[in-house]
A protein has these predicted regions:
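Short amphipathic alpha-helix used as the core "switch/output" element in two-component signaling
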Residues: 64-78
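Non-catalytic signal-transmission and effector/linker regions of two-component phosphorelay proteins
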Residues: 1-8, 113-124
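Conserved acidic carboxylate
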Residues: 11
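Two-component/phosphorelay signaling modules centered on CheY-like receiver
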Residues: 14-34
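Alpha4 helix (beta4-alpha4-beta5 surface) of REC/receiver domains from two-component response regulators
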Residues: 89-106, 110, 114-117
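The short loop immediately C-terminal to the conserved phospho-acceptor aspartate in CheY-like receiver
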Residues: 59-61
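Acidic, metal-coordinating helix/loop segments flanking the phosphotransfer/catalytic sites
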Residues: 35-53
Length: 124
């Protein structure tokens, strides 16, 4: 398994950030994990450091993450893997985000253990 994977978790919900951080720590060797709580801070963090994976919530303060947000991020950071993370309906939204460049979509009520493993396999 790849060591030192750099992950940015962008979600305004502290519990969701803690859960996902714990799962990444469980399944990865020595991951570097940073967290942001709004879209402005997410862009600022991306501008300061290179990440392997961005776990991006759709509904956040200072602007929601639309498919265009994914397009904009990928234009600046083409190697960055983006996974959407939302309580919104996956079936409706996932195709739009995948078409925009995201590699996955986790709905918050899904089995996060399984989804996290699948995402790690995709990123590695």
């Amino acid at each position: 398994m790849k060591e030192n994977l750099k992950i940015l978790i962008a979600d305004d919900n502290e519990l969701m950030r803690l859960v996902m951080r714990g799962l990444f720590i469980k399944y990865l060797d020595n991951p570097s994990i940073k967290q942001t709580t709004n879209l402005d801070d997410t862009f600022e963090c991306l501008s300061q450091e290179r990440f392997d994976l961005l776990l991006l919530d759709i509904n956040m303060p200072n602007g929601d993450s639309s498919p265009q947000t994914v397009v904009d991020i990928k234009a600046i950071y083409p190697e960055l893997k983006i996974v959407m993370f939302s309580g919104n309906d996956k079936e409706t939204l996932e195709p739009e985000y995948l078409a925009a460049g995201a590699i996955g979509f986790i709905q918050k009520n899904e089995n996060m253990n399984t989804c996290t493993k699948e995402i790690i396999e995709t990123v590695l």
